[in-house]
Swiss-Prot record:
Listed pathway(s): Cofactor biosynthesis; biotin biosynthesis; biotin from 7,8-diaminononanoate: step 1/2
Organism annotation: Haemophilus ducreyi (strain 35000HP / ATCC 700724)
EC code(s) of this entry: 6.3.3.3
Name the UniProt record assigns to this protein: ATP-dependent dethiobiotin synthetase BioD 1
Positions annotated to bind Mg(2+): 55, 102, 163
Chief localisation class: cytoplasm
Location(s) in or outside the cell: Cytoplasm
Length: 278
C-alpha cells in the first residue's frame, strides 16, 4: 500500500503533467490557427479571354512588386501551346515540352532565378488540352499537384503572382474550374481586359462572375490589343464606371512588351501594394 504522502505526490504530478499537456495542446492549436490565418499573399491574374495579355500583365505586376522591394515569384500552373490539332491519345508526361512562351516570359520577369518546373505544373503543346481534360478524355490534371506546387513556392517566396489559363471559368479538370481553385486558395484576382470590339460585355460578365464566386477583385488592367480601335478612351471611361474595382493601369500596343520594363504602365499600384503589405 502507498503512503498518503506518496499518493499526494503522485496526484500532484498528474495534475502538473495534465496542466503542462493542456498548455502544449493550446499552443499547438494557436500555431495552427495562426498558420491558417497568416496565409502567404498570392494573387491570381485572369482575363476576359485567351490572348488578352495576361502574361504581359503578370510581367508588369512582377516588375512593379520587385521595384517596391517585394520578394516575389510568378507561377503558371497550366501552360498550353499553339498547336491547334486535336490530341489523339493521353499524355504520358506532365511536360510535353519546357519551352512554353508564357512560362519563359514569367521566368524572365521574376527578380530572382527560378527553374521552369518550379513555376509551372503542366505544359502541353495542344491549345485544346483544357477542353479535353475537362471531359477526362486526354489528361486528368491533378488539383493536388497544383496545390503542392503553389505551397512549395509559398514556402520559399513571401509573395506569389499566379497566372491563369484562358478565361475565368476555364476548367482545370472534369471536377474543378480555375474559379473554384482560386476561391479554395483564398486568392484575390486582377482582371485583364483586352481592349477590342465587344470587350465591354466580356469584361462585365467576367467581373460579375469573379465577385459571384466570392473572390475579391482587387482591380483590372486594360491591355490595348487592337491599335486601330476607335473610341479607345471612351471604352476605358465606360469600363471604369461599370467595373466596381479600380483601374490599375493601361498597357499600350507596343512591340515586344515581353522584353520591356512595364512598370510605368501600372499607374495605380496602390491596391496591389496594400494587399501584399498585409
Amino acid at each position: 500500500m502507498f503512503s498518503d504522502k506518496t499518493r499526494n505526490l503522485s496526484r500532484k504530478f498528474d495534475q502538473e503533467h495534465h496542466y503542462t499537456l493542456k498548455k502544449v495542446l493550446k499552443y499547438k492549436q494557436f500555431c495552427n490557427y495562426f498558420v491558417k490565418r497568416k496565409k502567404i499573399p498570392s494573387l491570381f491574374i485572369t482575363g476576359t479571354d485567351t490572348n488578352v495579355g495576361k502574361t504581359i500583365v503578370t510581367r508588369a505586376i512582377l516588375q512593379v512588386l520587385a521595384q517596391h522591394n517585394f520578394s516575389v515569384v510568378g507561377y503558371k500552373p497550366i501552360a498550353c501551346g499553339g498547336d491547334d490539332d486535336l490530341p489523339t491519345e493521353p499524355n504520358q508526361t506532365d511536360y510535353t515540352s519546357e519551352d512554353n512562351s508564357d512560362v519563359l516570359i514569367i521566368l524572365d520577369s521574376c527578380p530572382q532565378p527560378v527553374a521552369y518546373r518550379d513555376i509551372n505544373s503542366y505544359t502541353f503543346t495542344h491549345s485544346s488540352t483544357p477542353i479535353f481534360a475537362a471531359l477526362d478524355a486526354v489528361h486528368h490534371i491533378q488539383e493536388e499537384k497544383l496545390d503542392t506546387d503553389l505551397s512549395n513556392l509559398q514556402q520559399n517566396y513571401p509573395n506569389v503572382v499566379v497566372e491563369g489559363t484562358y478565361g475565368w471559368l476555364t476548367p482545370i479538370n472534369k471536377d474543378l474550374s480555375f474559379a473554384e481553385w482560386v476561391h479554395k486558395n483564398n486568392m484575390p484576382a486582377v482582371l485583364v481586359v483586352g481592349i477590342k470590339e465587344g470587350c465591354v460585355n466580356h469584361a462585365l460578365l467576367t467581373a460579375q462572375a469573379i465577385q459571384q464566386q466570392g473572390v475579391n477583385l482587387i482591380g483590372w488592367v486594360a491591355n490595348r490589343i487592337n491599335p486601330c480601335l476607335r473610341h479607345y478612351a471612351e471604352l476605358i471611361e465606360l469600363l471604369s464606371k461599370k467595373i466596381s474595382a479600380p483601374l490599375l493601369g493601361q498597357i499600350p500596343y507596343i512591340a515586344q512588351p515581353h522584353k520591356k520594363d512595364l512598370t510605368s504602365y501600372i499607374e495605380n499600384p496602390d491596391p496591389l501594394l496594400a494587399y501584399f503589405q498585409k
